[in-house]
Swiss-Prot record:
This is Pentatricopeptide repeat-containing protein At1g62670, mitochondrial. One of its GO terms (molecular function) is RNA binding. PANTHER family: OS03G0856100 PROTEIN, PENTACOTRIPEPTIDE-REPEAT REGION OF PRORP DOMAIN-CONTAINING PROTEIN. PPR repeats lie at residues 44-79, 80-114, 115-149, 150-184, 185-219, 220-254, 255-289, 290-324, 325-359, 360-394, 395-429, 430-464, 465-499, 500-534, 535-569, 570-604.
Length: 630
């Protein structure tokens, strides 16, 4: 029965053209050009028929396949179209779709007519290359020549629709298959189910399984694998479990792939214990875990800080002679680094190298981070240079890690050198890169360079975020440049970016420390109008400002308001008020505050104890105050 398709207008423009844009096959790629020249130069000593045998095709490499094509088109008479289709199919299985398309063009140029099979292969290749209009054009030409597409051809086209984000047309295609007498097979249904999950249509995908069964097409392991994978990626692990039980109750036995998918989904959605239970369950059922199973569990355990459990799993997999891969080692190394166990991380790295497993960029970046955290910056730089020598080129994350290390330990100039080196390698720093540098330069007291880097960031098209502005404002305020900070703050308020409570706290503190307590108080009072609730830092900053100004009553009133507002005072609030009372000579009020502070679980800080000690020496206080603070 002939099926009628509405070929899109974009495809119709291609129908009269040849299979691909005209041109020499050598234009496909430099490597293909070499293979092509080889195919038509010199004589070969083998018979193409021998190479086209089943065993010959299974061992065929791309350059040999192209050379074989050259031999075939030189033969007279031409080999049969069936033999050409065998070769094109073999190359398509290598995922060399461009090569297949180009060879198909050459066949047409040489007058070798395509048939149903070669057209189907070409449609599949165009779809796999996300060139759906060209696939539709080939379909149109194929049908014009009287060839009816079969279910394999239509399944390829279906895949093209799914990957071209034309999912409604994909669904319509399957519906039309039924109407016109085609019987979609498992591959067809699996393709559409996968496409539906790709486009967040999980309910439609699940409903399609029931429709599939109703049409007499039983789901296979691939079907369940696609569905389980789709559900787990959405976090629907309960539904995935239900499907697993359904499989076990039926004739299908879920293998390690299905279990791995669910375990990985459970890990990603923080159901660690469920993942471990499923791991035990698969073992009791005789399903042997593989490196993927262990790697998922180890990575998840590491993310939870359960590095000892992760280490036990690593030992377990080695005992079972399941070789850990770079992903397994990298996850553990990163976990040890974050736990501050750099020695253990280095031992794992040595073990990895001993096993001839090439470290990845993640492995190197984790170790560089570890060295930076422990102020072993020279070793971090050596590791950085070593990874480059191994042709494992650092990305922006690696550079950021090293730059942050140098800035943290006051070696900002070296951090700047790394930043410039990154630019020379053609990598553009991201927002995090610039934030690190701006903060490092301010901490080093180089306000001018910090501002220059901010300007460079904007001119390079790297978008500042609220953290950038907070860093800039904090640096300017702490370096006594309140007026410049005010200009930046006013610009920020006019922009679409929302200042956070941290932003306001920076400005309130900057104003108070610059003696502009009233300005700080105005900004504090306006917080509620901006929809921002003051936090304990905001209250403490303002209380400290009032105390510094000598406005004792305002400080007391704000302290009372703070508690009434439901914001619990912290150690800083109490110590600030205690010191203010002691300086005013109000020993009774300070003693009451000390008792209240101690009842809340806080103790005197270094500044308060230092003040009390000095007053003891001066004879202005007795020892009982020091005892109360201890």
């Amino acid at each position: 029965m002939r099926i009628s398709f509405a070929i899109a207008s974009t495809a119709k423009r291609f129908v009269h053209r040849s299979l691909v844009v005209r041109g020499n096959a050598a234009t496909v790629s430099p490597s293909f050009s070499f293979f092509w020249r080889r195919a038509f130069s010199g004589k070969t000593s083998y018979d193409y028929r021998e190479k086209l045998s089943r065993n010959g095709l299974s061992e065929l490499k791309l350059d040999d396949a192209v050379a074989l094509f050259g031999e075939m088109v030189k033969s007279r008479p031409f080999p049969s179209i069936i033999e050409f289709s065998k070769l094109l199919s073999a190359i398509a299985k290598m995922n060399k779709f461009d090569v297949v398309i180009s060879l198909g063009e050459q066949m047409q140029n040489l007058g070798i007519p395509h048939n149903h099979y070669t057209y189907s292969i070409l449609i599949n290749c165009f779809c796999r290359r996300s060139q759906l209009p060209l696939a539709l054009a080939v379909l149109g030409k194929m049908m014009k020549l009287g060839y009816e597409p079969n279910i394999v051809t239509l399944s390829s086209l279906l895949n093209g629709y799914c990957h071209s984000k034309r999912i409604s047309e994909a669904v319509a295609l399957v519906d039309q298959m039924f109407v016109t007498g085609y019987q979609p097979n498992t591959v067809t249904f699996n393709t559409l189910i996968h496409g539906l999950f790709l486009h967040n249509k999980a309910s439609e995908a699940m409903a399609l399984i029931d429709r599939m069964v109703a049409k007499g097409c039983q789901p296979d392991l691939v079907t369940y694998g696609v569905v389980v994978n789709g559900l787990c990626k959405r976090g629907d692990t309960d539904l995935a479990f239900n499907l697993l039980n359904k499989m076990e109750q039926g004739k299908l036995e879920p293998g390690v792939l299905i279990y791995n998918t669910i375990i990985d989904g459970l890990c990603k959605y923080k159901h660690m214990d469920d993942a471990l239970n499923l791991f035990k369950e698969m073992e009791t059922k005789g399903i042997r875990p593989n490196v993927v199973t262990y790697s998922s569990l180890i990575s998840c355990l590491c993310n939870y800080g359960r590095w000892s459990d992760a280490s036990r799993l690593l030992s377990d997999m080695i005992e079972r002679k399941i070789n850990p891969d770079v992903f397994t080692f990298s996850a553990l190394i990163d976990a040890f680094v974050k736990e501050g166990k750099l020695v253990e991380a280095e031992k794992l790295y040595d073990e990895m190298v001993k096993r001839s497993i090439d470290p990845s960029i993640v492995t190197y970046s984790s170790l560089i981070n570890g060295f930076c955290m422990h102020d072993r910056l020279d070793e971090a730089k050596q590791m950085f240079e070593f990874m480059v020598s191994k042709h494992c080129f650092p990305d922006v994350v690696t550079y950021n890690t090293l730059i942050k290390g140098f800035c943290k330990y006051k070696r900002v100039e070296e951090g700047m050198e790394v930043f410039r080196e990154m630019s020379q390698r053609g990598l553009v720093g991201n927002t995090v890169t610039y934030n690190i540098l701006i903060q490092g330069l301010f901490q080093a007291g180089d306000c001018d360079m910090a501002q220059e880097i901010f300007k460079e960031m904007v001119s390079d098209g790297v978008p500042p975020n609220i953290m950038t502005y907070n860093t800039l404002l904090d640096g300017l305020c702490k370096n006594g440049k309140l007026e410049k900070a005010m200009v930046v703050f006013e610009y920020l308020q006019r922009s679409k970016m929302e200042p956070t409570i941290y932003t306001y706290n920076i400005m309130i503190e900057g104003m108070c420390k610059a003696g502009k307590v009233e300005d700080g108080w105005d900004l504090f009072c306006n917080l509620s109008l901006k929809g921002v609730k003051p936090d304990v830092v905001a209250y403490n900053t303002m209380i400290s400002g009032f105390c510094r100004k000598g406005s004792k009553e305002e400080a007391d009133a704000l302290f009372k308001e703070m508690k009434e507002d439901g914001t619990l005072p912290n150690s800083g609030c109490y110590n600030t008020l205690i010191r203010a009372r002691l300086r005013d000579g109000d020993r009774e009020a300070s003693a009451e505050l000390i008792k209240e502070m101690r009842s809340c679980g806080f103790a005197g800080d270094a500044s308060t104890i230092g003040l009390v000690t000095n007053m003891l020496h001066d004879g202005r206080l007795d020892k009982s105050f020091l005892d109360m603070l201890s």
